Amino acid sequence: MTTMAETQTWQTVLGEEKQEPYFQEILDFVKKERKAGKIIYPPQKDIFNALKLTPYEAVKVVILGQDPYHGPNQAHGLAFSVRPGVPAPPSLQNIFKELHADLGVSIPSHGFLEKWAKQGVLLLNAALTVEAGKPQSHANIGWHRFTDKVIESLNDHPEVIVFLLWGSYAQKKSQLITNLRHRILKAPHPSPLSAARGFLGCRHFSKANQLLHEMGRGEIDWALD
């Protein structure tokens, strides 16, 4: 017997949204900016990597970010992740510190989080593009409407999902998660400005696995090396 989760895909839950005029306007805006010579991150082929690498039916954990990295060779479509060979930015370093303190896994030698994505960890930024060197430059071009729709579609997911909401921006999205089946864990943002105020010590990685285990969903192997 197939469950509803197995029959639903990103295409079935987001297909209509992608037909909305605003969505095409976002894509046209990004295309024009690139044509005008502006550097936009991530590269075009990577914009929807979070959805490509973590199928709807496979989502177990959601980690929300705000904006892609705006430096060269960093952003590749997964929140907090950087390409292989690129040093882990400060927030990601703090994520790894907490991972080590929580689970005892070694601090990874890289910041490439694709292994998490392929296990069902949706690494979703609220805005999916950014202009080089200009944080939040694409925050108001319509991406938030689309990524809110992604979160709303996950709220309807028939399986338990654990949402890790780090920082006040991500925590505001909890109002979209109304289904009591899901679990929400909140902590300050892992950035150096706030990590010591409660992100370090939050133990979200072990707590997420405990919740997944209790619901029979299978734990995440958070180790990256």
Swiss-Prot record:
It comes from the Bacteria. CDD domains: UDG-F1-like (cd10027). PROSITE patterns: U_DNA_GLYCOSYLASE (PS00130). One of its GO terms (biological process) is base-excision repair, AP site formation via deaminated base removal. One of its GO terms (cellular component) is cytoplasm. The keyword Cytoplasm applies. The keyword DNA damage applies. GO terms for molecular function: uracil DNA N-glycosylase activity. It catalyses: Hydrolyzes single-stranded DNA or mismatched double-stranded DNA and polynucleotides, releasing free uracil. Gene3D superfamilies: Uracil-DNA glycosylase-like domain. Its EC number is 3.2.2.27. Pfam families: UDG (PF03167). The active site is at D67. InterPro entries: UDG_fam1, Ura-DNA_Glyclase_AS, Uracil-DNA_glycosylase-like, Uracil-DNA_glycosylase-like_sf. Keywords: Cytoplasm, DNA damage, DNA repair, Hydrolase. It is found in: Cytoplasm. Excises uracil residues from the DNA which can arise as a result of misincorporation of dUMP residues by DNA polymerase or due to deamination of cytosine. Belongs to the uracil-DNA glycosylase (UDG) superfamily. UNG family. HAMAP family: UDG. This is Uracil-DNA glycosylase.
